[in-house]
């Protein structure tokens, strides 16, 4: 019922995968040859690479179209000659099969020119070399803005062209099918015609261990859907201890169980253990013929970040944000910048971005910038409550201000790196507004405190000393000055006019 977290490595399934990928490679190569497209592309047709080309590219396409039309005319001419020779009764050697074989020879000769690796005999590895990352096999639909809309690279094919493309790959597959079993022949015939076999790879297995794994997998998903977390945890703990089970296929449901199970360790510890055990630094030896290749989006590679590593970074950031939520108990405590969880996460990411694949992943750089954003928010929040605590004064205050400015600078720098890497959308305007609010906490709140201190000093003195400090009050707050002028008596107004006249004479 559900996907089984094992990889069957017996000879029958290895032969099935070889036949499937070999046929796909033949079809792709023949299609690229007929459609006059380069075989060096590493992605499927997407709206990005189907935009309007320049004039040079259009001229190149016109020249390629001209050569294609000439080749079609030559084929029609040869076909017409064969027809009239057969009508006359002349025996000729250029039969259809021989012409097809000549096309195959020219196609094989063209492989050396296009740079196809002939030494690599693994058809599955040939196929996945074109798709280093899973997202390259998806189409990108730009429908948010009318300016970013691009035409989809649609290609129509007639039934005649399809049969022409399919003829030579099927003929090439006759020799590999001679050494296959009858079951694998039926499997190949079904997938080549676009059919899907009803029997899965695990439904035919009669091994006791595999049958137990299939049963436990079904029970695990059923109990998770019913929110029976205690029983699901027992099944998960039993399943990951069976030899042959790939934990990399079960980590998602395992984290969900650990997060919802009471009186147990958090799923964050499990993700941290996954990052330590399944490191992306492990080297893949090309000379070894691996019978089963695990997809890179499960294990991670030097060009692709593992999904559980990204999930671990996001979960750690959310955990740090929850532990630093503003409350009366947290604000009154002194802030420790060396031993908190957020600083540990920043140090960990700073080590990760020095090595591939993290240094080329835009999402990792965005998480790195988000950590410094949270750090700047936490440090700048101390200035809001400075009037209550009176802790930040003198040199200590200047140090805290420099720390906030440093983290704000890191946020802008890492966001720029994230945008340069591409492939990740960033709310730049929202983040910039938050950074400006952090800066306003440093200076805007200090100015308000200074104004309040001046107002308190003026309230504490008597009216006889108003004219002595009148100029200082005027320079600080003009509105406060106007209200006091309205309350002064006529005698005080006369003294005030004498005060201004003395200032003008001194100037």
From Swiss-Prot:
GO biological process: nucleolar large rRNA transcription by RNA polymerase I
Start-end of Acidic residues biased regions: 97-108
Places the protein is found: Nucleus, Nucleolus
Taxonomic superkingdom: Eukaryota
Polar residues bias (residue ranges): 37-47
Cysteines engaged in disulfide bonds, as pairs: none
Entry GO MF terms: RNA polymerase I core promoter sequence-specific DNA binding; RNA polymerase I general transcription initiation factor activity; TBP-class protein binding
InterPro entries the record matches: RNA_pol_I-specific_init_factor, TIF_Rrn11, TIF_Rrn11_budding_yeast
Pfam families in UniProt: Rrn11 (PF04090)
Key words of the record: Nucleus, Transcription, Transcription regulation
GO cellular component annotations of the record: nucleolus; nucleus; RNA polymerase I core factor complex
Biased composition, class Basic and acidic residues, residue ranges: 109-124
Region (Disordered): 37-76, 89-124
Assembly and binders: Component of the core factor (CF) complex, which consists of RRN6, RRN7 and RRN11. The CF heterotrimer may further dimerize to form a hexamer. RRN11 interacts with RRN6, RRN7 and SPT15.
Role, per record: Acts as a component of the core factor (CF) complex which is essential for the initiation of rDNA transcription by RNA polymerase I. After binding of UAF (upstream activation factor) to an upstream element of the promoter, CF is recruited in a SPT15/TBP-dependent manner to form a preinitiation complex.
Other facts: Present with 476 molecules/cell in log phase SD medium.
Name used for this protein in its record: RNA polymerase I-specific transcription initiation factor RRN11
């Amino acid at each position: 019922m559900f996907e089984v977290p094992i990889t069957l490595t017996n000879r029958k399934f290895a032969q099935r995968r070889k036949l499937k990928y070999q046929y796909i490679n033949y079809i792709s190569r023949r299609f690229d040859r007929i459609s006059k497209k380069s075989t060096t592309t590493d992605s499927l047709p997407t709206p990005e690479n189907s935009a309007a080309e320049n004039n040079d590219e259009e001229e190149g396409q016109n020249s390629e179209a001209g050569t294609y039309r000439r080749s079609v005319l030559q084929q029609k001419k040869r076909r017409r000659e064969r027809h009239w020779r057969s009508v006359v009764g002349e025996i000729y050697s250029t039969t259809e099969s021989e012409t097809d074989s000549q096309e195959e020879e020219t196609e094989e000769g063209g492989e050396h020119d296009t740079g196809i690796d002939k030494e690599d005999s693994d058809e599955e590895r040939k196929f996945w070399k074109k798709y280093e990352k899973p997202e390259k096999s998806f189409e990108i639909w730009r429908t948010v803005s009318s300016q970013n809309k691009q035409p989809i690279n649609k290609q129509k094919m007639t039934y005649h062209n399809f049969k022409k493309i399919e003829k030579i790959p099927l003929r090439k597959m006759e020799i590999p099918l001679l050494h296959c079993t009858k079951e694998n022949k039926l499997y190949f015939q079904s997938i080549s015609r676009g059919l899907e076999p009803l029997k899965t790879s695990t439904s035919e297995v009669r091994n006791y261990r595999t049958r137990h794994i299939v049963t436990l997998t079904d029970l695990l998903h059923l109990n998770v859907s019913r929110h029976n977390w205690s029983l699901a945890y027992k099944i998960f703990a039993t399943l990951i201890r069976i030899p042959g089970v790939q934990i990399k296929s079960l980590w998602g449901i395992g984290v969900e169980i650990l997060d919802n199970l009471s009186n147990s360790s958090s799923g964050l510890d499990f993700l941290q253990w996954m990052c330590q055990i399944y490191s992306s630094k492990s080297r893949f030896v090309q000379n070894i013929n691996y019978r089963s290749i695990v997809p890179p989006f499960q294990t991670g590679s030097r060009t692709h970040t593992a999904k559980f590593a990204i999930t671990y970074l996001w979960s750690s950031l959310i955990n740090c944000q929850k532990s630093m939520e503003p409350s009366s108990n947290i604000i009154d405590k002194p802030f420790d910048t060396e031993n908190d969880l957020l600083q540990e996460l920043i140090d960990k990411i700073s080590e990760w971005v020095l090595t591939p694949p993290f240094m080329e992943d835009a999402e990792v750089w965005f998480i790195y910038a988000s950590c410094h954003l949270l750090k700047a928010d936490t440090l700048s929040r101390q200035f809001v409550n400075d009037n209550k605590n009176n802790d930040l004064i003198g040199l200590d205050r200047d140090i805290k201000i420099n720390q906030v400015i440093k983290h704000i600078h890191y946020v802008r720098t890492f966001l720029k790196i994230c945008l340069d890497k591409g492939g990740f959308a960033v709310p730049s305007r929202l983040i910039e507004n938050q950074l400006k609010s952090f800066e306003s906490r440093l200076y805007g709140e200090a100015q308000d405190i200074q104004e309040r201190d001046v107002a308190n000093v003026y309230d504490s003195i008597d009216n006889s000393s108003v004219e002595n400090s009148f100029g200082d009050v005027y320079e600080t707050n003009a509105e406060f000055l106007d209200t006091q002028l309205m309350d002064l008596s006529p005698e005080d107004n006369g003294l005030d006019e004498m005060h201004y006249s003395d200032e003008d004479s001194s100037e």
